[in-house]
């Protein structure tokens, strides 16, 4: 974050490479932008999980700590975690921390009757304040645009559709159809013919003599250029729309085909996608989610299998590659834990996961509304609960993978264990019948204890009576003996 990367030093390069590569350390390049925090992970987005969980956990441990040196160490660790999360550039991490902290504070405020009204007032004030900030400040506008996005692809880019037919290629430019075809002249030159939707020929003007690029003499297609090209001895054409090249070749069997970035001739097929999210929502995750949603219907009962999202998600999304994440780049993750779980484990598997998470969260809320927070163990459990909250929220815009999942499930298990310890220690959630039975048992014991002195006194009186009777009998005998 401060421009000091240990892995870019000679020591760091030796640390992360094999001995056989030590003579080529100068050729080792790093793809991370300068000033980006990534620790030992290959993706800075994963830091939103790690430090998103650690920040609330360390804060709770600080509150529960008793010794000064413990608090000092926790403050240093908290500052370092905040710096790393800031350096990762992950907006979703900060949003998850803020949302998790808000829920945790509301849980604490709900412990008292009067504080509940304070919590309700804070919720209302927070909603109103968020709306005002989002619509009146540049900071709020940026946050709002990051979350909701700003555009749909068909509204942002002029090329909306492509059709590879037998006789031509039809490109839809701002709702205007442009037909492009070509023929091979006797001298071997490629002659391009352009028409509008009514079949009217469109004139062409040489725009670049060196590349033989032609512009179209029509205002509707002012951003379109065509170029005759040869692809390994195969004649074809390139159509440039907004500076992006789309290559087509005419074949004898299938007519016109699209030459995709992998160099394969295919019939262009429009990929199904949802319009639920804007393309740039959550740093272009909206487009990925739109492409994932149509796949969900296939996996209501049975998922595709672990780590098979890459095979299920349509990878012939050429518009997305051209305008959003680049050609020959493929989405291997859904960038949403729950959507990916649905694809890979099915709807029922996803509902089971969500149900398990909700069970822990609801039970934790019930516990920490009642438990004694003067105990250190209580703050440990509450910190683990807050950490799980942040992870569950951050997972809406991130993937749970082998880099982050072990830490989460470890904290989740610790949270469950601490919750059980607190329930047992403070006798929480005891049923009314059990309470009544305990009270009755205590009452019976008390009655027995109260009755014990009475019984003892009765026994003592009986004993005294017997002693008196015997003394009377003895005195009579003595009197008779005296008479004799």
Give the ranges of each region predicted by the language model.
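Alpha-helical transmembrane segments of multi-pass inner-membrane proteins
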Residues: 1-229, 353-383, 388-396, 408-418, ...
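Membrane-interface capping segments at transmembrane-helix boundaries
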Residues: 420-430
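Short, highly charged, low-complexity non-transmembrane loops/tails of multi-pass membrane proteins
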Residues: 430-444
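Juxtamembrane membrane-water interface segments that cap and precede transmembrane helices
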Residues: 23-40, 287, 322-341
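Intrinsically disordered, Lys/Arg-rich low-complexity segments
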Residues: 462, 467-482
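TM-adjacent membrane-interface loops and short helices in multi-pass inner/ER membrane proteins
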Residues: 43, 181-183, 252-331, 345-352
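Transmembrane signal-anchor helices characteristic of membrane glycosylation enzymes that use polyprenol
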Residues: 1, 127-136, 244-245, 254-256, ...
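Membrane-interface anchor segments at the N-terminal boundary of transmembrane helices
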Residues: 48, 333-357
């Amino acid at each position: 974050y401060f421009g000091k990367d240990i892995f870019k030093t000679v020591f760091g390069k030796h640390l992360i490479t094999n001995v056989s590569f030590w003579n080529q350390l100068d050729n080792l390049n790093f793809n991370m932008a300068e000033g980006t925090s990534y620790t030992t992970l290959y993706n800075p987005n994963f830091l939103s999980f790690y430090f998103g969980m650690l920040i609330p956990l360390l804060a709770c441990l600080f509150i529960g700590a008793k010794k000064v040196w413990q608090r000092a160490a926790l403050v240093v660790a908290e500052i370092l975690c905040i710096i790393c999360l800031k350096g990762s550039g992950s907006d979703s991490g900060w949003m998850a921390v803020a949302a998790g902290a808000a829920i945790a504070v509301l849980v604490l405020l709900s412990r008292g009757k009067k504080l509940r009204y304070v919590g309700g007032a804070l919720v209302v004030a927070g909603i109103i304040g968020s709306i005002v900030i989002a619509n009146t400040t540049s900071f709020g506008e940026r946050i709002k645009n990051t979350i909701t996005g700003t555009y749909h692809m068909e509204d942002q880019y002029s090329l909306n559709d492509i059709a590879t037919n037998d006789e031509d290629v039809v490109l839809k430019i701002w709702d205007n159809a442009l037909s492009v075809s070509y023929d091979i002249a006797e001298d071997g030159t490629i002659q391009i013919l352009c028409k509008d939707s009514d079949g009217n020929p469109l004139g062409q003007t040489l725009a670049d003599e060196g590349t033989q690029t032609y512009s179209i003499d029509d205002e509707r297609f002012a951003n379109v250029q065509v170029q005759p090209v040869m692809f390994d001895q195969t004649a074809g054409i390139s159509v440039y729309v907004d500076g992006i090249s789309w290559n087509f070749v005419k074949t004898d069997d299938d007519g016109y085909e699209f030459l995709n970035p992998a160099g394969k001739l295919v019939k262009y097929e429009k990929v199904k996608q949802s319009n639920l999210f804007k393309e740039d929502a959550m740093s272009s995750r909206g487009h990925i989610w739109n492409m994932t949603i149509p796949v969900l219907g296939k996996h209501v009962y049975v998922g595709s299998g672990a780590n098979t999202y890459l095979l299920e998600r349509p990878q012939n999304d050429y518009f997305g590659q051209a305008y959003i994440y680049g050609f020959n780049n493929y989405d291997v993750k859904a960038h949403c834990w729950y959507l990916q779980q649905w694809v890979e484990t099915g709807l029922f598997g996803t509902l089971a996961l969500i149900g398990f998470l909700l069970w822990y969260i609801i039970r934790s809320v019930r516990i920490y509304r009642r438990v004694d927070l003067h105990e250190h163990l209580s703050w440990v459990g509450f910190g683990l609960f807050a950490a799980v909250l942040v992870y569950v929220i951050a997972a809406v815009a991130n993937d749970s993978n082998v880099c982050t999942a072990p830490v989460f499930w470890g904290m989740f298990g610790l949270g469950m264990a601490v919750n059980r310890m607190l329930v047992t220690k403070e006798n929480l959630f005891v049923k009314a019948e059990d309470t009544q039975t305990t009270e009755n048992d205590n009452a019976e014991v008390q009655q027995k204890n109260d009755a014990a002195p009475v019984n003892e006194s009765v026994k003592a009186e009986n004993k005294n009576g017997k002693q008196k009777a015997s003394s009377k009998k003895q005195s009579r005998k003595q009197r008779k003996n005296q008479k004799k």
